[in-house]
Each structure stands twice: as structure tokens, then as C-alpha cells.
Amino acid sequence: MIESQVEIAARDGATTTFVVHPERGGPHPVILFFMDAPAIREELRDMARRLASSGYYVMLPNLYYRAGVMELGPIPPDPDHPARKQMFQLMNSLDIDLVMSDAEGLLAFASADPAADDSRVGTVGYCMSGRYAASLAARHPERVLAAASIYGTHLVTEAPDSPHRTAREGRAGSRTDPVTEAA
């Protein structure tokens, strides 16, 4: 595996992005892997590595770069703990348009890297970023061939850019969750 942490130009500055892909056999399809609210941490890097080990060029951007935050550390369950409050403040500082502008920079970076096949793009978002994965697929249907929202939040809102309004297709379910089995 080839791993690097690079600064990628975005509209509002540079986002520190963890990039990982196989050493050989490229160019590799691109996956934009959007973080969850607790920010970049080793668990997410490990998940990116696992995706890359299946033949993908994975980009894990720091969405909190505007605030100068890279990692938050452990988030205690206490809702009044300062670390949890900071996490929610950072999470609420983002919106679909901001993250889509970041994605433009990420896709431009991938286009310039011979290890990446930017004609085949997928995206995955966890929790707060599920909406970003769905929105990126809706905004770039010719380029983003698959999107996954894993326990995504804010997928259906009253906002005009709500992912449920812009998605071409949506599927939900779980083999083991009785709630989604019934749906």
C-alpha cells in the first residue's frame, strides 16, 4: 500500500487528506471517504486502508480544516463535556455546499494523480457525512457511480438541497435490523 497525508487545495484553504491505494495495478477507482463527527482518527484510516486493499484509491479528507482542527481525541458520552460540545460545534459548521466545494478540490487532485481512475468514483459517508456522500452522487451522476451513507443523518430535511430531493435512487436496509426488514 502507498499511504500519504497531503494538503489538497479547496475553496476555503487546504484540507489535510489521508490518501491510500495499492502500489500496483492502477489506475484505481476513487473513493471519497467522508469522516464522521469525531473527526479523523486511526479507526478511519484503518477503514480507508481496508477499502484500498480491495483495489481502490481512497481519499479521507479532514472536513474540519476551516477551524484548524485535525483530530479531536476520545469523545466522552457526557453531553456537557467540552470535547463533545466542540464536536457538535464543528459538525454544525459544515453544510452540503461547503463539503461539495471541498469535493471539487479532491476530485481535481485525483484527476492529476496517475494512480487514480477518476472516471470511476464512489463515495461513502458515515453519520454526519452520509448526506455528503448522497449529495456528491446527485451532483455528479456522470462521475460518481456509487454512494453509501452508513447510519447517515440529515438525509431527509426541509432544505432545498436535502439529499432525498436530489438522489436518483435510494435503497436502505439491513439483513439483521428488524426495523429495516419491515420497511
Predicted regions and their residues:
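N-terminal cap/leader regions of alpha/beta-hydrolase-fold enzymes
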Residues: 1-183
